[in-house]
Amino acid sequence: MAVLAGRTQRVLANGVYSGLAVTAALGALALGNALRHGLMAPMPAQTAVSASPQVDDARGTGHAAVAGLDAGALRHAGQGAAPSAALSRPISALSRSQGSDVPGNTSVSVRATSPRPLLATMPALEITPLREIPLGLVGDVAGLAQARDFMLVLGADGRLWARGLNTRGQLGVGIAQAQVNDFLPLPGHDYQAVAVGGAHALALDRQGNLWGWGDDRYGQLGRGRANHTPQDRPTRIARDIVAMAAGDRHSLAIRKDGALLAWGENRWGEVGNGSQESVTEPVVVGEGFRAVAAGAGYSLAIDRQGRLWAWGRGESGRLGTGNENDQSRPVLIGNGYRSVTASTAQSFAIGQDGTLWAWGSNLLGQLGDGTHEDRLSPVKIGSGYVAVAAGGAHAVGLQRDGSVWAWGSNGVGQLADGSLDDRLRPARIGRGYDFIGAAGAASTLARRDGVLRMAGARLLQ
């Protein structure tokens, strides 16, 4: 999940942690589909190919011009970059994850996380309609970050509100209550971006201070040591920050001078410092960066020249290097990128020309290229995109004309198209929203005036 500050975006959440563990999230999604279709689908072959897919419209079939170059952003839709796993909107060039892209700017929301075990919702396998989520006292929305079982909303007034599971202090509201059903305010009132990981969260205030709270067992809060006692209120991690991203158990940030910082779990090399030892305080792993995204055991970043870099876990091709090898230091993937989104095992990027690219796991068609084949290198999906958010095995995209598109697994109606049919290519599902989000087996569509609707698995009860 990633975030930039200073700009509003159209990406609510990247679903990076929407399937925190490929086994828990993706596995549950696969099982749901298997039950629905009567058998388990075979694992797709892993190949790297370039495709120029046809785009299906939810109401029929149509075609979309698929042209473009590289890409890279989180959620993007307004005039700027969008963070991974959170609410974002493009600016000049966006989730959340969701996520971010414009040099020197920060996005408004961040990326998201993993879904509740789908087995709980599986028996009925009914379509969950697009439903409105009451925001209580929040008011107008400027950003949103949703994780597997909790959600953070950034108000237009700079205040943060939280609701959901709180077993690791991930709400940041300073109470020991395990579940909070109404949105409660966090301390402080000058935030501009928020991001969520597996069970921790990050927020950036307007002075460039980076704050963190929640689970710190892997040093993901950057306090100098791993802590088994959760941090239930925001604690300052760093200063002079302009972009950030929260992964499953690690965190990334970019300083005003372009230095890329990383810390937390490092089992797969996701910190990028050349080792596999956890890092409990921020370390510099690169210079000249402007955007970051953090996924499940891996990291993505875009430098000021528009070059895309990847490191960490390589399984299923999520790094886009052309193979499945893990990388403990940043590896160059390509040029011409504007923003990037990281999720469980699939990645998306938007090129400087608005083309959408995807790579990684594709078991349930979540890449949108018309196949079930994993892609070890970026393949072109479509054009005209300003934001993309990724869930456990589905994705939602926002085009510059305001239309919203969805594709991938639809076992619990997360594509918001009124069906339970998976879609291997982008299908238009609506328009008129300012923000999009995806996490686990759920999708979120929101407007600036505080209207927030979700489809799919209920992340919040």
Q: Model-predicted segments: where are they?
A:
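N-terminal secretory signal peptides that target proteins for export/translocation
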Residues: 1-8
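Eukaryote-biased RCC1-like beta-propeller repeat architecture
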Residues: 8-461
